[in-house]
């Protein structure tokens, strides 16, 4: 995400999804002014000094979360989000961090609602099957 305006919009209008490892504030995907509609995930990672004192730890937390997001199976749902890691992100094994992200991101398509565009309007919904988990909690595409 770029600029204070986008962060402020997500902070004020976003839905908070909490996990012991992080908090994810998320809103619907809306293209920037003049951009073409290309639904994608735009995620800003914010680590405060209050959460992790040392810059080394803040940077390590950012890198771990960024890599976990990059390597997620099934990709990311289209949204704008702010991810706020907790100190546990540094010590938890990497597969657990990925599993926590999958759990929380699976809730995103159902929790985020687009504003306006009533019946017959210009509403776009998430395509069926866009969540990375099936109804019984398994990753989509696994036996």
From Swiss-Prot:
Catalysed transformations (reactions): Endonucleolytic cleavage of RNA, removing 5'-extranucleotides from tRNA precursor
GO cellular component, one term: ribonuclease P complex
Keyword Transmembrane: no
Domain of life: Bacteria
Residue ranges the record marks as coiled coil: none
One GO BP annotation of this record: tRNA 5'-leader removal
PROSITE patterns found in the cross-reference section: RIBONUCLEASE_P
Alphabetized UniProt keyword annotations: Endonuclease, Hydrolase, Nuclease, RNA-binding, tRNA processing
A Pfam family matched in the record: Ribonuclease_P
EC number(s) reported in the record: 3.1.26.5
GO function terms (MF aspect): 3'-tRNA processing endoribonuclease activity; ribonuclease P activity; tRNA binding
Location of the region described as Disordered in the Swiss-Prot/TrEMBL record: 111-143
PANTHER family hit by this protein: RIBONUCLEASE P PROTEIN COMPONENT
Assembly behavior: Consists of a catalytic RNA component (M1 or rnpB) and a protein subunit.
Family the UniProt entry places it in: Belongs to the RnpA family.
Role: RNaseP catalyzes the removal of the 5'-leader sequence from pre-tRNA to produce the mature 5'-terminus. It can also cleave other RNA substrates such as 4.5S RNA. The protein component plays an auxiliary but essential role in vivo by binding to the 5'-leader sequence and broadening the substrate specificity of the ribozyme.
Protein name: Ribonuclease P protein component
């Amino acid at each position: 995400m770029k600029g204070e305006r986008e962060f402020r919009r997500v902070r004020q209008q976003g839905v908070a999804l909490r996990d012991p490892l992080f908090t994810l504030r998320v809103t619907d995907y809306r293209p920037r002014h003049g951009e073409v509609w290309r639904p994608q995930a735009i995620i800003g990672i914010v680590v405060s000094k209050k959460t992790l004192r040392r810059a080394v730890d803040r940077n390590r937390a950012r890198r771990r979360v960024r890599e976990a997001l990059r390597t997620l199976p099934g990709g990311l749902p289209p949204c704008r989000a702010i991810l706020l890691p907790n100190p546990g992100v540094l010590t938890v094994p990497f597969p657990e961090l990925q599993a926590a992200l999958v759990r929380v991101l699976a809730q995103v398509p159902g929790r985020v609602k687009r504003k306006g565009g009533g019946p017959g309007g210009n509403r776009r919904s998430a395509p069926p099957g866009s969540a990375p988990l099936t109804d019984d909690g398994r990753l989509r595409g696994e036996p």
